[in-house]
UniProtKB/Swiss-Prot annotation:
Gene3D superfamilies: Ribonuclease Z/Hydroxyacylglutathione hydrolase-like. Belongs to the metallo-beta-lactamase superfamily. RNA-metabolizing metallo-beta-lactamase-like family. CPSF2/YSH1 subfamily. Keywords: mRNA processing, Nucleus, Phosphoprotein, RNA-binding. GO terms for cellular component: mRNA cleavage and polyadenylation specificity factor complex. Residues 417-430 have a biased composition (Acidic residues). Residues 407-452 are annotated as: Disordered. CDD domains: CPSF2-like_MBL-fold. Pfam families: Beta-Casp, CPSF100_C, Lactamase_B_6, RMMBL. Component of the cleavage and polyadenylation specificity factor (CPSF) complex, composed of CPSF1, CPSF2, CPSF3, CPSF4 and FIP1L1. Interacts with CPSF3, CSTF2 and SYMPK. Interacts with ZC3H3. The gene is CPSF2. This is Cleavage and polyadenylation specificity factor subunit 2. Signal peptide: none annotated. Residues 407-416, 439-449 have a biased composition (Basic and acidic residues). It comes from Bos taurus (Bovine). The modification Phosphoserine is found at residues 419-420, 423, 660.
Length: 782
């Protein structure tokens, strides 16, 4: 690589937590995913806060919270302000994930980490892309291009390919799936051969995955046995990702008459179920070839479900007849309708709980997967209830005081406006030359003013209280009061309003009624629950298995490999396997949390700071697309608060070509201590650079003129003899190859020696010097 490439791990290494990594390519910094775990750990936020103002672009790979969950917080609370790139389905389904996550938390607790407005503000910054669409970055990212490729894990899931100057190829591929499924094709790998750097995960590196047919049979058997035993089935799924695969599978099974499931109910339960299905209908072109053909040939949208009922709450689900199969979010059972149904149904041995996703360790779902024999567990019961009695009275009193304070503030503002209007009116009275005009519409104050020779010191009012109502005006005329136009029959009485405020309504109420306009509080209790229902884990994660991951990496043959997101033993196993088949041709890194990996392979490239006096003294010569100069300088250390991303690079000053090189002479007899410090910074531990405010960076300063040593001329950009022949012919010099030697005008011979250098032979004549000058012009000489 001829670029400086570093990866800083903010989260998701040597563990199964959320994914978040900072990739530096020369001066440009990418944030690869911006995930948040199920427990909303603030450690991820603290790591992100240190680097948030350095980030130039965010690349999102999947729409679930583990890949973009922290984005609303980063934009709303941390001030993240940069371009965000994602595919169209990741944009749409990502919103559904975050809406459902927020509502699931808000229904049972006082959730304040982010709001729906934060979600909207974050997703408004996303630039939506299509698969294989090449985006050339500008500004600091000049020369960089990004391309999203299908990952096959979720709809819109992306493998990101980052290319620098058409040469360096960096591939970010996490949670990919090479197998074709009902609603998605597998990932495309034909465009990812021999990348310079591959960043991938080891989540499934040691996982032995059952065959898909075996998993489908296990699911069908479980569902049939439970329904025929008059029990209900809870399938814990995500909001808008892998749920589409299960919805397609179950709806197809329900259509099959031989299965005999048509008499049972099938439901999808989450806060945005209708929107998820509608978005899926409009994104068929992002799905598998099979669904595309079905849509094109039969003109039948595959997401027009026949048997799947869409429910947005427990009251909707209560109207679905039992026994039933319910696809409910969230997959971790930490919040949402899946947790509510689990608490209701797990104590009945007739029911069945099916887990389809290995969530982060520490969640309820992961506990049940890792401890299948555990039958008793402590569960925190959270719910939102109406305020009653003294609490309700205190709340209403506080609200009343707030309204009175707001009303007083509004009245004071109106009084200020009225006083300003009165002063304007008095100024109008003082103008005797004012021309009085007639209008069809009544203008403000017209006809109510009486002239007076002396200005009154105080405005007179009638004896009895009769305040004059001043007519408010704006650019469009008199301001309208909406309450003046309400139909009296439709206005609620004060008694009804007070009942609504106090939450006192008659009649039956749904178990999940909207409490947004009613005073509520959240309560929490911990109970020991006995699990009598059958709990089963069936893998519908949509990831490649361990053996396939190793074969895919071997097929790609990356020159460097960084392994992230996976347990330590899985990462170690994948690293050893890659070293075994790659040998010395591959470098494998397994970074720790908050560690910076330097993936720059060229040893002569470092980051230094050039003084303006040094840059102004350089004499550049052009070679193809690059400009080169010789530098004589000395390294010094400096404490700087400037972002190191703007530092010029020693190996690529004004460099766009592949043959560029910058050579540095730094005599050892000048400032030896500074040299040692600079070298320690250059070759030392890069992982200490964690984006702190002040960093010690090496600075290259010019040598005094009397200390500048001489140097031999360096010839760069060596030409090919065939190209030089064309140059000679254009100049009217006869040239032809004789035994591998270029003979010019039968007087001068140009040959390439065994060491690869070009030699010029011939008698000293005018043609010799002319040909030599033409040969020199092909080089960049510094």
């Amino acid at each position: 690589m001829t670029s400086i490439i570093k990866l800083t791990t903010l989260s998701g290494v040597q563990e199964e937590s959320a994914l978040c990594y900072l990739l530096q390519v020369d001066e440009f910094r990418f944030l690869l995913d911006c995930g948040w775990d199920e427990h909303f750990s603030m450690d991820i936020i603290d790591s992100l806060r240190k680097h948030v103002h350095q980030i130039d672009a965010v690349l999102l790979s999947h729409p679930d919270p583990l890949h973009l969950g922290a984005l609303p917080y980063a934009v709303g609370k941390l001030g993240l302000n940069c371009a965000i790139y994602a595919t169209i389905p990741v944009y749409k389904m990502g919103q559904m994930f975050m809406y459902d996550l927020y509502q699931s938390r808000h229904n049972t607790e006082d959730f304040t980490l982010f709001t729906l407005d934060d979600v909207d503000a974050a997703f408004d910054k996303i630039q939506q892309l299509k698969f294989s669409q090449i985006v050339n970055l500008k500004g600091k990212g000049h020369g960089l291009s990004i391309t999203p490729l299908p990952a096959g894990h979720m709809i819109g899931g992306t493998i990101w390919k980052i290319v620098k100057d058409g040469e360096e190829e960096i591939v970010y591929a996490v949670d990919f799936n090479h197998k074709r499924e009902i609603h998605l094709n597998g990932c495309s790998l034909e465009m990812l051969s021999r990348p310079s750097l591959l960043i991938t995960d080891s989540f499934n590196a040691t996982y032995v995955q059952p065959r898909r047919k075996q998993r489908d049979e296990q699911l069908l058997t479980n569902v049939l046995e439970t329904l025929r035993g008059d029990g209900n089935v809870l399938i814990a799924v995500d909001t808008a990702g892998r749920v589409l695969e299960l919805a397609q599978l179950l709806d197809q099974i329900w259509r099959t008459k031989d299965a005999g499931l048509g008499v049972y109910s099938l439901a999808l339960l989450n806060n945005v179920s209708y929107n998820v299905v509608e978005f899926s209908k409009s994104q068929v072109e992002w799905m598998s070839d099979k669904l595309m053909r079905c849509f094109e040939d039969k003109r039948n949208n595959p997401f027009q479900f026949r048997h799947l009922s869409l429910c947005h709450g427990l009251s909707d689900l209560a109207r679905v007849p039992s026994p039933k199969v319910v696809l409910a979010s969230q997959p971790d059972l930490e919040c949402g309708f899946s947790r509510d149904l689990f608490i209701q149904w797990c104590q009945d041995p007739k029911n069945s709980i099916i887990l389809t996703y290995r969530t982060t360790p520490g969640t309820l779902a992961r506990f049940l997967i890792d401890n299948p024999s555990e039958k008793v567990t402590e569960i925190e019961l959270r719910k939102r209830v109406k305020l009653e009695g003294k609490e309700l009275e205190e709340y209403l009193e506080k609200e009343k005081l707030k309204k009175e304070a707001a009303k007083k503030l509004e009245q004071s503002k109106e009084a200020d406006i009225d006083s300003s209007d009165e002063s304007d009116a008095e100024e109008d009275i003082d103008q005797p030359s004012a021309h009085k005009t007639k209008h069809d519409l009544m203008m403000k104050g017209e006809g109510s003013r009486k002239g007076s020779f002396f200005k009154q010191a105080k405005k007179s009012y009638p004896m009895f209280p009769a305040p004059e109502e001043r007519i408010k005006w704006d650019e469009y005329g008199e301001i309208i009061k909406p309450e003046d136009f309400l139909v009296p029959e439709l206005q609620a009485t004060e008694e009804e309003k007070s009942k609504l405020e106090s939450g006192l309504t008659n009649g039956d109420e749904p178990m999940d009624q909207d409490l947004s306009d009613v005073p509520t509080k959240c309560i929490s209790t911990t109970e020991s629950i006995e699990i009598k229902a059958r709990v089963t884990y069936i893998d519908y994660e949509g990831r490649s298995d361990g053996d396939s991951i190793k074969k895919i990496i071997n097929q790609m043959k990356p020159r460097q490999l960084i392994i992230v997101h996976g347990p330590p033993e899985a990462s170690q196993d994948l690293a050893e396997c890659c070293r075994a088949f790659g040998g010395k041709d591959i470098k494998v890194y397994m970074p720790k949390l908050h560690e910076t990996v330097d993936a720059t392979s060229e040893t002569h490239i470092y980051q230094v700071r050039l003084k303006d006096s040094l840059v102004s003294s350089l004499q550049f010569c052009k070679a193809k697309d690059a400009e080169l100069a010789w530098i004589d300088g000395v390294l010094d250390m400096r404490v700087s608060k400037v972002d190191t991303g703007v530092i010029l690079e020693e190996g690529e000053l004004k460099d766009d070509g592949e043959d560029s090189e910058m050579q540095v002479d730094a005599p050892s007899d000048s400032s030896v201590i500074a040299q040692q410090k600079a070298m320690k910074s250059l070759f030392g531990d890069d992982e200490k650079e964690t984006g702190e405010e002040s960093e010690i960076i090496p600075t290259l300063e010019p040598l005094p003129p009397h200390e500048v040593p001489g140097h031999q001329s360096v010839f760069m950009n060596e030409p090919r003899l065939s190209d030089f022949k064309q140059v000679l012919l254009r100049e009217g010099i006869q040239a032809e190859f004789v035994g591998g030697v270029l003979v010019c005008n039968n007087q001068v011979a140009v040959r390439r020696t065994e060491t690869g250098r070009i030699g010029l032979e011939g008698c000293l004549c005018q043609d010799f010097y002319r040909i030599r000058d033409l040969l020199y012009e092909q080089y960049a000489i510094v």
